[in-house]
A protein has these predicted regions:
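Conserved beta-strand positions in the central sheet of alpha/beta enzyme cores
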Residues: 31, 60, 101-102, 148, ...
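Histidine-acidic metal/acid-base catalytic patches
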Residues: 1-26, 45, 52, 134, ...
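Catalytic domains of carbohydrate-active enzymes, especially glycoside hydrolases
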Residues: 17-35, 96-100
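Glycine-rich, proline-tolerant flexible connector loops at the mouths of alpha/beta enzymes
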Residues: 31-52, 108-109
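Residue-level detector of anion-binding/catalytic polar loops
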Residues: 28-29, 57, 99, 146, ...
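Active-site acidic/histidine proton-transfer and metal-coordination neighborhood
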Residues: 53, 72-179
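Active-site-proximal loop/turn and secondary-structure-junction residues that shape catalytic pockets
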Residues: 9-11, 34-36, 64-67, 106-108, ...
Length: 268
């Protein structure tokens, strides 16, 4: 396993500055969360030169915008705007050899599903989402890029909260560029046993997001990190583990500390 960190967590006015900080702090990879409105040829050129300039590899790429999370919206215009943005991210990943992720929906849920967890897609919803997933996968077919499903907690998505629910869709599409992106923070709200869920997901797991139970850096909440990393080792996971959480203070201090904490788990 190798360490990775999400770009919004890292100080720096440019991708290059962020990557150089990460290189100094013990992270060989970066996940790029790129504001869609700020995307242009100059930023693209910087992204594609990043590894050569800094030694830090961009392994995940997502566009961020207020339209994010609406790929299955009932609003035709909003749905198409979101899908166009997702398709653009997938095309970047096809050229870069990186992973991107999608989900059925993303955003605050109203009404909040406090006492009605694990809601399931009906047959029409499932079929429509699978059709969209296959459309996204076709954009990266034949490349090293991946389009992954990330299980989100019930307060951010009404459906597909469990790793197993997402795994069933990955199995149905049966595409070599598909896979899972479990996030330990989301899992802490939905899974009764994180390690067991990871073991069951097995080789469907392509990328991992890390955040503790309070979405702080690993080791600053309630999660049993030794059992999580033991499970990843048992399934033979050798990919990237990416921090996607609060920096819990000054990142120049806390991110190097987190790298040491995670490295000890990886090598234990």
């Amino acid at each position: 396993m190798q360490l990775c960190c999400s770009s919004p967590m890292v100080p720096g006015a440019t991708l290059t500055a962020k990557a150089r900080n990460l290189q100094a702090w013990g992270y060989p990879a970066i996940a790029i969360f790129q504001p869609y409105a700020e995307w242009n040829q100059s930023v693209r050129d910087e992204l594609f030169a990043l590894e050569g300039r800094t030694g830090v590899r961009p392994v995940e790429f997502v566009f961020t915008d207020e339209i994010y999370g609406n790929a299955m919206s009932a609003d035709d215009d909003l749905r198409e705007q979101c899908r166009a943005m997702y398709r653009a991210a997938a095309q970047v990943c096809a050229d870069l050899g990186a992973a991107t992720e999608i989900e059925y929906q993303y955003g605050p849920q109203n009404p909040m599903p406090l006492f009605d967890p694990y809601q399931q897609l009906d047959s029409g919803q499932r079929a429509s989402f699978i059709d969209f997933y296959r459309e996204m996968l076709a954009l990266v077919e034949g490349t090293k890029a991946r389009v992954l499903l990330e299980p989100l907690n019930r307060y951010e998505s009404r459906y597909l909260n469990l790793v197993a629910d997402n795994a069933s869709i990955v199995d149905e599409v049966a595409h070599p560029n598909a896979g899972l992106l479990p996030d330990t923070f989301h899992m802490s709200l939905e899974e009764s046993d994180l390690a067991a869920a990871l073991r069951t997901a097995g080789d469907r797991i392509v990328h991992v997001h890390l955040g503790d139970s309070n979405r702080l850096l690993p080791g600053r909440g309630l999660l049993d990190w030794a059992s999580i990393f033991d499970a990843l080792k048992e399934i033979g996971y050798t990919g990237f583990v990416n921090l996607e959480c609060s920096t819990s203070g000054d990142p120049a201090v806390t991110l190097p500390e987190a790298a040491r904490f995670l490295h000890a788990l990886i090598t234990a």
